[in-house]
Amino acid sequence: MATPAPSASHPAPATAPAGAPTPAFQPRHKIRLVTATSLFDGHDASIHIFRRIAQATGAEVVHLGHNRSVREIVDAAIQEDAQGIAVTSYQGGHNEFFRYMHDMLRERGAGHVRIFGGGGGVILPEEIAALQAYGIARVYSPDDGRALGLQGMIDDMLGRCDFATVRAEEALPAFTADDHRALAKAITLVENHPDKHRETVQKRLAAAAYVPPVLGITGTGGAGKSSLIDELLRRFLLDFPAMRIAVLCVDPTRKKTGGALLGDRIRMNSASDPRVFVRSMATRR
C-alpha cells in the first residue's frame, strides 16, 4: 500500500528536535552518587535539580548540600563507596577545587570515583578542556545543556558511573576501625550480596572481643533525627576523645524508580571528624 505524500490531511511524521530529552537511562548496577556544591558556594539550585533527576533515574543520591570542602566530599565518597561525585562550582575556584579533589581521591586509593562538575558560564571552555585532560570525568557546559537536555546530561553521568565497586566473588575484607575505605567495601559486599557473606559476618561478630552498644533512632520525616544524632556525636567526641563511633542511616527506596535520597549527612556537622564513620543506605525494597 502506497504511503500518501505529506499534505494538510496527512502531515509528515514528527521528529524529535535536537536536544530533546532522551528516554531515562536504565542502570545495570546500584549507582551511588555524592552531590554537593563547592566550598564558599551557596548557589545550590542547579545541584538540587540534578540530584532530583538522578534520583528519579534510579541512583542512590547522597546529598551533602552547599559549601562543602574537598575533604568533606572525598570522605563521604569513600565512606559511601560511591561511584561518582557531582559538584557545582560557581565561586571561581573550580580549577584548584576539582584538581585537588582528583588528587585526594587518588592518594586515598579511590581513583576509580568519577568526578563531574558544572558551573554555567563561570567555567570557560578552555578550562573545561584542561580539567577533563587532568582526569575529571566530565564538566558540563551551557552548550551541553542545550545539546543534551537535563535528562541527557544525567544519562551521560550515570552511564559513566554504571560499574560495580566490588565483585560478588570477593572475600569480605579484614579491616580496622580507622580504615574507612575497607569498611565501606565490606558494607557494600554485605549489602549487595547478603547471602554470600552472612555466615562470615556472624562468625566475626561471635569472635569479637568487644561488642559495642547499638542505639537505634527512628521517627517521622522532619522529626529532627539527624539534628539529634549530630548533637549526640558532638558530645560523644568531646567526652570520649579516644573512642570512635559509626552511624548507619537508612532511607526508603522509591518503588517506581529504584532511586533514593540519602540526605542525613546535611545536618550532621560533627560527621566530618575522622573518628566518625557514616554510611547511608537505601532499603532497596
Give names to the regions the model predicted:
Residues 41, 220-223:
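ATP-binding Walker
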Residues 27-33, 210-213:
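A short, charged/proline- and glycine-enriched loop
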Residues 5-6, 150-213:
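Extreme N-terminal, non-catalytic leader segments
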Residues 215-217:
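Hydrophobic anchor at the beta1->P-loop junction of P-loop NTPases
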Residues 40, 47-57, 61-152:
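Cofactor-cradling patches in redox/metallo enzymes
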Residues 1-4, 17, 21-31:
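Non-catalytic signal-transmission and effector/linker regions of two-component phosphorelay proteins
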Residues 191-212, 223, 229-285:
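Nucleotide-state-sensitive switch-loop elements of NTP-binding domains
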